[in-house]
Amino acid sequence: RITEPTSGRGELFGRVGSLLEVGSGFHPELSGRENIFLNGSILGMSHREIARNFDEIVAFAEIEQFIDTPVKRYSSGMYVRLAFAVAAHLEPEILLVDEVLAVGDAAFQKKCLGKMNEVSKAGRTILFVSHNTAALLGLCNRGLLLERGN
C-alpha cells in the first residue's frame, strides 16, 4: 500500500501492478537489466518469474541494445517504456496506470493500450487514469469522471 485512504476503506483481492510515476522503483545508477529485477521484486514478482518474463519485458520496452546501460542515461520515453513493460508483465489481477502514457510516443501508447486490452480480456482489472478521452473510450467499459475531486 502506498498511502492509507483518507476516508473509507478498500479491499484488494490479488496482486497489484502499478505504474504511478515514471521510473518509481528504479535506481538511476543501475542498468536496465538490474532495474528490471529490482522493480519486478518491488512489484512482488519472484526472481524466477522475472527471469521467465525478462526477454518479453525487454522486447516490449524496445531497449534491447541499451539493456546494460544505466537508466540515468535513458530518455524519458525509454524510462517509461521499461517501467510499463515491467508492470504489465507482472500479470497482476489489478493494474493501476496513472497518466504515465503521456510520456511515450504515439506508437508506444498504442502498444500499451493493446497490452492493457490483453490484461482486461484475461479478466483482470485495470484502473486507468487519463485525460485522453479516446484512449479511455477504447479501453474502458466503465468509467468515473472526477471534477475538482468529486
Regions found by a protein language model. Name each.
Residues 6-14:
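ABC nucleotide-binding domain "signature motif"
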Residues 148-149:
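Conserved ABC ATPase "signature" C-loop
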Residues 17, 37, 49-66, 83-85:
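Conserved ABC ATPase "signature" region
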Residues 138-145:
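Conserved catalytic segment of ABC-fold P-loop ATPases
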Residues 132-138:
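Conserved H-loop
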Residues 86-97:
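A short, proline-enriched helix->beta-strand linker immediately N-terminal to the Walker B motif
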Residues 109-122:
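Helical segment within the ABC ATPase nucleotide-binding domain
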